[in-house]
């Protein structure tokens, strides 16, 4: 059982579904982005996919947004996120065949932006595209809106569209 105000169960939080199955893509995208904005200014916490009361890391932020929009990103999960070996769930999301790959030039609000670690071809970061070359992401020190390409993340691995 999750006890609020403690670290017990911090990664057992799953955002409530905020879009109905019959609603259009826009409703699902806005539910995802609305959930992400609940974390604005909250601390970046390594390996964390918790409630907005605590904070999240980058893939935790995306997972909570996906839950709110109506996607359970199995086998990636909030509960398993803190377990050893799952720290890099951005890689798992990037490899997820259920998420449609789209060209960078075709990116749209609600798409996921994946980044390579500098000097490698290893995915190490993910953010939610807001439009107008801006993303919402969790990166030290906190959840923020940033340019799609910036000094920390400037090698884009690809774009995936969770809501078709």
Describe the predicted segments one by one.
Residues 71-145, 149, 164:
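...with weaker cross-activation on analogous glycine-rich loops/strands in unrelated enzymes
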Residues 9, 13-19, 51, 84, ...:
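Intrinsically disordered, low-complexity, compositionally biased regions/tails
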Residues 6, 11, 56, 113-114:
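Intrinsically disordered, low-complexity segments enriched in small/polar residues
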Residues 24-28, 50-57, 99-105, 119-122, ...:
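Extracytoplasmic/periplasmic, Sec-exported soluble proteins
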Residues 26-96:
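Secreted/periplasmic proteins that engage bacterial cell-wall peptidoglycan
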Residues 59-60, 67-69, 135-137, 150-152, ...:
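Short, surface-exposed linear patches
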Residues 1-45, 105, 153-164:
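Intrinsically disordered, low-complexity
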């Amino acid at each position: 059982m999750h006890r609020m105000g403690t670290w017990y169960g911090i990664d057992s939080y799953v955002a409530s579904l905020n879009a109905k199955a019959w609603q259009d893509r826009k409703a699902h995208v806005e539910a995802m982005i609305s959930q992400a904005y609940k974390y604005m200014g909250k601390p970046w916490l390594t390996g964390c996919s918790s409630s907005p009361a605590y904070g999240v890391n980058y893939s935790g932020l995306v997972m909570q947004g996906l839950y709110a929009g109506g996607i359970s990103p199995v086998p990636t999960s909030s509960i398993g996120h803190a377990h050893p070996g799952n720290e890099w769930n951005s890689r798992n999301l990037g490899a997820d065949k259920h998420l449609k790959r789209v060209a960078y030039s075709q990116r749209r609000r609600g798409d996921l932006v994946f980044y390579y670690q500098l000097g490698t071809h290893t995915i190490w970061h993910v953010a939610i595209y807001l439009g107008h070359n801006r993303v919402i992401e969790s990166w030290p020190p906190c959840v923020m809106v940033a340019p799609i390409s910036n000094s920390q993340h400037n090698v884009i691995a690809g774009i995936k569209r969770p809501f078709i």
